[in-house]
Amino acid sequence: MKLYTKISSGKFKGKRLELPSLSTTRSTKSIVKESFFNVIRDEIYSLTFIEGFGGSGVMASEAVSNGAREAIAIEKDRAAFKITQNNLASLECSNLKAINGDSFSVLPDIINSQSGKVLLYLDPPFDIRAGFDDIYEKLVNLISQLKKEKIYMIVFEHNSDFKFSDEIFAFKLVKFKKFGATSLSYFQ
């Protein structure tokens, strides 16, 4: 049985997107998604939105729906990537694309190739995939490779049991919001 989610706001509001297998991805809860876009909605227009660990591509789709200049969803799992590709294609939107790759490997080059600023949304599969026990340490190492002048904001969706430092290299924590077992940490 296939599972679906819907785009909750913007020009694609109500469009249905397929969700990949729950054994390989974990979809962002509606309340988290809604809160995030309420926070950044007025700031997203000139930005490229990059969704690391894309899953279904719903956050990238929602970003373009809400006016992002461009959105990119990166997904490593092949089956999930196929679903992401199909979801993005169904929106018939030229400024929305999917990349099959490991976010830890491809993100620095993708960000550095952007002409404008990037809003980076990182939602790793922290409680799903084997080998992700040290996911937050890997994320901090990834951030060390990014050029501050290319980044408008980095937002982590993470397990509420984990708390990021108030500073990660050149980026400072500017907002934190908890939603039960899931939290969002915003860095600029």
List PLM regions with ranges.
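S-adenosyl-L-methionine
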Residues: 1-66, 77, 82-115
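Short, glycine/acidic-enriched loop or turn micro-motifs at the edges of active sites
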Residues: 54, 78, 105, 126, ...
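Conserved SAM-binding motif I beta-strand of class I
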Residues: 70-75
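General small-molecule cofactor/ligand-binding pocket signal
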Residues: 97-99, 174-177
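S-adenosylmethionine
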Residues: 111-172, 178
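Core SAM-dependent methyltransferase catalytic element
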Residues: 175-188
